[in-house]
Amino acid sequence: MRGWVDVIAACGRPHQRDAAVELGAQRFTTEDREVTGAADVDLVVVLTPPASHGRLAIAALEEGKHVLLEKPLSTSLDEAKALVQMARRGPGLLLTAPFTPLSPTFQTIARHIRRGDIGTPCSARARYGWSGPWWSEWFYKPGGGCLFDLGVYSIASLTGLLGPARRVMAMTSVALPDRQVADRTVRVEVEDNAQVIIELGSGALAVITTGFTLQQYRSPALEVYGSTGAVQMLGDDWDPEGYELWRNDAGAWQVFKETAPDWPWTDGLRHLVECIRDGTKPCLTPEHAYHVLEVLLAAQRSGKERQSIDVTSSFDPLNLGDAGPTEAAHLVHDRTREHSPPAAGATGAGSD
């Protein structure tokens, strides 16, 4: 983003001053109003713990600023609803993480699904987790938890691919009640382990595994199974490593190497700045972010109440823009037929 924006002001704790200045901030403050209300600030980036997301975003939107917001949109549906309404009527754009649908690999997979390459989607799986943060205790306190921090990625990706959810059922637990944060032991007060089942509006079912309990894994980040095929993203949805496509009419798995290995999971900043510059709307909408939050809160509630929870919000399909370039043939590896000569008139397996 060098040359696109200037870092006018940064807000944080006193010990963060030197780092902010070193990274280019022209001034530093510990008072957030000195950023959200500053006349020379056009775009506010909120990177605080979730409990303060809504308050800070509302303050910035009230001042006519554009806002880039860490996930989730808020921890409260009422606050989130106010944010969506402000974004609809105000001059400022609102873009909320996760930004996984911006990746070229995600968008290519979405086009395969929309084009009917795997038939009607019937079921899906998603997974994201790790052993858990050791640098701050808010992850293990109310307003934190593995769903807000990790499950949000899977929910954003699955609903981005398959559309809105209509019902959620979850089992959540505290698997490891004591965590080491820096040099002290912290008691875990929110879920660190979750399994979520989502019934989508289309009738498809999706399962999400997430938690601060996954030491390592090698399975795909996302899997979508349709009536005539399947597609799965390799790596994590925030760091794709290509994808695999099965079509019954092809009779083989086609393996597509990652075509954008340098794509950053922070790409939302670039996207938002481009939208501001060009006068366009982001392809990730506040309505989608609100829906993701409703699913998250429904999963938390379901885990506590041990019953399914209906989801009432919706959103329009994500605008993926024009189709991306066709993958070069040398980037494609068909692991069941790689040594077979192509049939007469056949096209490359990587055509998108």
For the regions a language model picked out, list residue spans one by one:
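Core-facing hydrophobic residues within beta-strands of well-ordered domains
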Residues: 5-7, 41, 121, 165
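Glycine- and charged-residue-rich phosphate/anionic-cofactor binding loop of Rossmann-like
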Residues: 6-7, 254-258, 275-292
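N-terminal Rossmann-like dinucleotide-binding module
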Residues: 1-23, 347-352
